[in-house]
């Protein structure tokens, strides 16, 4: 990138590049750099499927849950612990074991541990804190039976959805961990929760993960670069085509005088 007065530029292999529309596909470990590149394209006038600011918001899982919870969307009871001395008190605010312990930097189900007792939870968190990890503590939703739901939001609608089912003996349903997928039709409440969650983060394209509970659907997290292979296979819907159709319309109708969300 070349950051200069009134003339931002992007280069690839020594050649200057520019696009009308960009579709960010950014690995979690590349968030800072990826968001910076998207921001540069936005300053050059490109339309991004998701703004650099919305990508940064969604990748900060704690911030995302704070924003989602603030608009009244249901989610698992969640605690955040910073100091080791506060571990037990935070666990008590979440409830009774078992607890789900999550690394904020984890992806695809990695960095997620189920602890069956208070002692096991404390030990797991203390171990993670030794490497200065940021940790979320969530209630375990036993009635979900190792299943969750992925909804793809594009614009103001859900264009595809699927159910993910964990392999035997595993509580995480991620496909990368051996889970299987099947087509699933969302309820109106699930659709509303998914769309609201994407919108409050400023995302136009998002994968929203939900879990079914005795008190209704709960939002687990929102992904700004959702994988498409599994959901396209399960639903039979060409999600990539839906995204391109949406962006073509947005490109033709957008107001370029509107302030950029950076």
In which residue ranges do the predicted regions lie?
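Phosphate-binding site of ATP-dependent enzymes
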Residues: 112-201
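Short, conserved loop/turn and helix-capping segments at secondary-structure boundaries
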Residues: 115, 233-238
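Glycine-rich phosphate/pyrophosphate-binding beta-alpha loops
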Residues: 28, 223-235
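ATP-binding N-terminal substructure of ATP-dependent carboxylate-amine bond-forming enzymes
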Residues: 1-49
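Protein kinase-like catalytic core scaffold
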Residues: 99, 159-160, 206, 218-220
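Glycine/Thr-rich phosphate-binding loops of Rossmann-like dinucleotide-binding domains
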Residues: 32, 109, 216
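Active-site nucleotide/adenylate-binding loops and adjacent lid/helix of ATP-dependent enzymes
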Residues: 9-11, 15-17, 42-45, 49, ...
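A long amphipathic alpha-helix within ATP-dependent nucleotide-binding catalytic cores
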Residues: 131, 170-219, 241-242, 246-261
């Amino acid at each position: 990138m070349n950051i200069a007065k009134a003339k931002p530029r992007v280069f690839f292999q020594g050649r200057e590049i520019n696009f009308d529309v960009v579709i960010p596909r950014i690995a979690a470990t590349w968030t800072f750099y990826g968001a910076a590149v998207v921001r540069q394209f936005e300053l050059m006038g490109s339309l991004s499927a998701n703004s650099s600011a919305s990508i940064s918001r969604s990748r900060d899982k704690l911030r995302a849950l704070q924003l989602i919870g603030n608009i009244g969307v249901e989610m698992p009871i969640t605690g955040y612990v910073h100091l080791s001395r506060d571990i037990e008190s935070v666990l008590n605010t979440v409830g009774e074991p078992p607890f789900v312990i999550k690394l904020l930097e984890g992806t695809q189900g990695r960095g997620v541990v189920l602890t069956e007792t208070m002692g096991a939870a404390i030990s797991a968190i203390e171990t993670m804190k030794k490497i200065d990890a940021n940790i979320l503590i969530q209630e375990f939703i036993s009635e979900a039976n190792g299943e969750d739901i992925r909804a793809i939001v594009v614009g103001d609608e859900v264009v595809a959805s699927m159910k993910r089912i964990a392999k035997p003996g595993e509580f995480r349903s991620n496909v990368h961990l051996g889970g299987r997928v099947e087509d699933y039709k969302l309820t109106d409440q699930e659709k509303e929760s998914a769309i609201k969650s994407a919108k409050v983060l400023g995302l136009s394209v998002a994968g929203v993960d939900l879990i079914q509970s005795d008190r209704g659907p709960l939002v687990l997290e929102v992904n700004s670069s959702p994988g498409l292979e599994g959901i396209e296979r399960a639903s039979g819907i060409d999600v990539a085509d839906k995204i391109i159709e949406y962006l073509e319309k947005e490109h033709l109708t957008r107001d370029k005088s509107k302030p950029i969300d950076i």
